[in-house]
Swiss-Prot record:
Organism: Streptomyces kanamyceticus
PROSITE patterns: AA_TRANSFER_CLASS_3
PANTHER family linked: GLUTAMATE-1-SEMIALDEHYDE 2,1-AMINOMUTASE (PTHR43713), GLUTAMATE-1-SEMIALDEHYDE 2,1-AMINOMUTASE 1, CHLOROPLASTIC-RELATED (PTHR43713:SF3)
Protein name in UniProt: 2'-deamino-2'-hydroxyneamine transaminase
Pathway the protein acts in: Antibiotic biosynthesis; kanamycin biosynthesis
Catalysis performed (reactions): neamine + 2-oxoglutarate = 6'-oxoparomamine + L-glutamate; 2'-deamino-2'-hydroxyneamine + 2-oxoglutarate = 2'-deamino-2'-hydroxy-6'-dehydroparomamine + L-glutamate
Domain of life: Bacteria
GO MF terms, alphabetically ordered: pyridoxal phosphate binding; transaminase activity
One Pfam family from the record: Aminotran_3
Length: 392
């Protein structure tokens, strides 16, 4: 039986108390299950206000793919800050260079349009599709951010008078076909988020073909998978060529940038659709993305994180079995999640707290996201995981 480590979170507690009085962020601080305030990171480790160190399994919602404060990315960003970050004209050498790199990454694509967040990119893609097709409605499945068009998937967030132009088909292929058979002439686009551990490639190929049959643009929300999957994103692995993909997380190793990468039929509607903003041409994001893409390609990060993810996933499954805990770990390559459906109520919260005490920062209700540098700490990670299970 392991002993319960006692960590000092006193400075973090005072900071959280003060913060809750003047600012708020329900993700993930407000619910109180993270007693620490993270202040810096290096490689796979993050550090809190009290000086405690943790191995990071969140990858900052999956946005950090290489590792925190990767020197090559830091240097690129520092160079930009000494030159100025935002200018009135959008054209810049860095924007052009990044657009060309993205067209190489997704070789079927013709243009790239840049934004700041994944939510912005997917919302832009939906509106661009409406203008490109002259149709109004969107069929979607999966999570696409917080913007209004997607509120059909989050009914508790909808204002009382809100009417969405998007309809969720919840990955139900029969419902999807039915909607398109009955309303295909109204559907501008189908927007899907890949869930590789739940559906095979044939499923996504069928979604794509049915959309094409009805003249609907097909958009793959690769905000999380676009760079974790390697060149071509998940779309290439699935053997499909969409009309557009949206990308963000992992592209700039934690810096804010996103893009719609697609066919000119869709992207040429930019001016008429009015989907641009002041900050979409920040140089910091371009520089961070270029440096990150150099690293991803030079070190074959997708292959490394796939191997690491599978090693950690199998190790975690073995530990659960050794402790007699009915917890699954469905996943795909560089990311996996924990399945507590057959476990006792409250186990997820208890495990998360135990892991934190043993120096693993994670969210048991979300994906475990591998970073490139996680490979250097696989044994340590599993040792800490085993110690945490011993505390339950």
């Amino acid at each position: 039986m392991s002993t319960h480590p006692v960590l000092d979170w006193s400075r973090s507690a005072e900071h959280l108390r003060r913060s809750h009085g003047v600012t708020t962020d329900p993700r993930p601080d407000e619910d109180g299950h993270y007693p620490c305030v993270l202040t810096r990171g290096s490689g796979t480790r993050v550090y809190d206000l009290d000086g405690n160190a943790y191995l990071d399994l969140t990858g900052s919602f999956g946005s950090v793919l290489i590792g925190h404060a990767e020197p090559a990315v830091v240097r690129a960003v520092t160079d930009v800050l000494s030159e100025g970050n935002l200018f009135y004209t959008g054209a810049s050498p860095r924007r052009l260079a990044l657009a060309e790199r993205l067209l190489d990454w997704f070789p079927w694509s013709e243009q790239a349009i840049f934004y700041r967040t994944g939510s912005c990119a997917v919302s832009a893609a939906a509106r661009l599709a409406q203008h490109a097709t002259g149709r109004n409605r969107v069929l979607s499945s999966g999570y696409h951010g917080w913007h209004d068009w997607h509120l059909e998937a989050v009914p508790e967030a909808k204002p009382k008078t809100f009417e969405s132009y998007a309809t969720e088909f919840h990955n139900d292929l029969a419902l999807y076909r039915s909607w398109l058979d009955r309303h295909g002439e109204e559907i501008a686009a189908v927007v899907v988020t890949p869930e590789p551990h739940r559906f095979d490639h044939a499923y996504y190929q069928e979604l794509r073909e049915v959309a094409k049959e009805h003249g609907c643009l097909f958009v793959v929300d690769e905000v999380k998978t676009g760079f974790r999957a390697g060149a071509g994103g998940f779309s290439a692995l699935a053997g499909i060529e969409p009309d557009a993909v949206t990308v963000s997380k992992g592209m700039a190793n934690g810096h804010s940038i996103s893009a719609v990468v697609g066919q000119r039929q869709l992207t040429q509607e930019l001016s008429e659709a009015h989907v641009w903003s002041t900050y979409q041409n920040e140089q910091v994001g371009f520089a961070a993305a270029l440096a990150s893409l150099d690293f991803l390609e030079r070190h074959d990060v997708a292959a490394v994180t796939r191997r690491t993810g599978e090693a950690v996933r199998q190790g975690v499954l073995q530990l659960f079995a050794e402790h007699g805990l009915p917890v699954g770990a469905p996943g795909w390559g560089p990311m996996f999640e924990l399945d507590f459906d057959a476990a006792d109520e409250g186990l997820a919260e208890r495990l998360e707290a135990a892991l934190l005490r043993h120096g693993i920062f994670c969210d048991t209700g979300d994906d475990f996201n591998m970073m490139f540098h996680t490979a250097e700490h696989t044994d340590e990670l599993l040792e800490r995981f085993a110690a945490a299970l011993g505390d339950l």
